[in-house]
C-alpha cells in the first residue's frame, strides 16, 4: 500500500487527488500532499513509539482520515476504522477489544472522546484532526498538525524509518467491526494481501 501511494505521487504529482469541504471552503489535496502527509504522520508514529500500534480512526470524510489509515498500516500497525454514528459506549468497547493505544478523529468527535478519558485509560494519544474547541487539559491530546510538524522535522534530519520499514504481505493490518445485525459485532482481521487484492480487483473491474 505504501509503495502504491509513493509511485502515485511520482506519476501524478500536483494533480488533485481529492476535493474536500472545509467549513464553507472547497479545498484541494494533491497526490504529493497525500504522500507528504503519509510520510510525516508515519514518521511521527515511529517517533512516538506508535509503530506496530493499533490505532482507531473515526469521524467524517476528510483526507487525513485516509492518510491515517495508510500511514498506520505502513508502519506495521493495525488500523481500526469506526463509524462516527456509533454509540460512544460501543465505540469505547470496540477500541478496548481491538487493543487500541491511539485514536484519530475529526471535529464532529471533539469532546465526545476526551470527555470519556477515564473510560479510555488504554488510549495514550487522542489526535484531533480539527482541534478547535477540543480540550487539551488531559495531557494525552496532541493535534494531527502537531504530529505532522514533528514528523516533518524528523524527515529533515534524514529519518527514513517510515520508507525503510519492511512489511510482510500476510501481516494483519486492519480490524473491521461488523454491524452485528445477527448478534454481537465481530472484528474481521485483514492482511496487507487482502487490501492490495481488493484494490487490484477494484482497478480491474
Question: Which residue ranges define each predicted feature?
Answer:
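Conserved S/T- and glycine-rich ATP-binding loop of Class I adenylate-forming
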Residues: 55, 72, 103, 172, ...
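Conserved pre-ATP/AMP-binding loop-to-beta segment of ANL
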Residues: 13-16, 128, 141-145, 152-177, ...
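Conserved AMP-binding/adenylate-forming core of the ANL superfamily
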Residues: 17-62, 66-70, 87-92, 96, ...
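Hydrophobic alpha-helical segments in the ANL/AMP-binding
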Residues: 6, 46, 63-82, 91-92, ...
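Structural core segment of the AMP-binding/adenylate-forming
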Residues: 74-150
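AMP-dependent adenylate-forming
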Residues: 4-29, 133-135
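Solvent-exposed alpha-helix faces
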Residues: 39-43, 96, 108, 183, ...
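Conserved AMP-binding A3 loop
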Residues: 28-32, 165-166, 173-200
Amino acid at each position: 500500500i505504501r509503495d502504491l501511494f509513493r509511485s502515485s505521487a511520482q506519476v501524478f504529482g500536483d494533480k488533485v487527488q481529492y476535493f474536500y469541504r472545509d467549513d464553507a471552503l472547497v479545498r484541494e489535496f494533491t497526490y504529493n500532499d497525500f504522500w507528504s502527509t503519509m510520510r510525516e504522520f508515519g514518521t511521527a508514529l515511529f517517533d512516538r513509539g506508535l509503530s506496530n500500534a493499533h490505532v482507531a480512526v473515526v469521524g467524517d470524510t476528510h483526507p487525513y482520515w485516509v492518510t491515517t489509515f495508510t500511514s498506520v498500516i505502513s508502519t506495521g500497525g493495525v488500523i481500526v476504522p469506526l463509524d462516527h454514528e456509533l454509540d460512544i459506549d460501543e465505540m469505547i468497547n470496540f477500541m478496548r477489544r481491538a487493543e487500541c493505544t491511539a485514536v484519530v478523529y475529526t471535529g464532529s468527535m471533539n469532546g465526545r472522546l476526551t470527555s470519556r478519558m477515564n473510560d479510555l485509560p488504554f488510549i495514550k494519544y487522542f489526535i484531533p484532526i480539527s482541534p478547535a474547541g477540543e480540550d487539551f487539559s488531559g495531557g494525552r491530546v496532541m493535534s494531527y498538525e502537531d504530529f505532522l510538524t514533528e514528523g516533518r522535522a524528523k524527515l529533515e534530519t534524514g529519518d527514513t524509518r517510515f520508507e525503510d520499514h519492511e512489511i510482510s504481505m500476510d501481516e494483519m493490518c486492519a480490524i473491521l467491526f461488523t454491524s452485528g445485525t445477527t448478534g454481537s459485532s465481530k472484528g474481521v482481521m485483514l492482511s496487507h494481501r487482502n487490501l492490495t487484492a481488493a484494490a487490484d480487483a477494484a482497478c480491474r473491474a
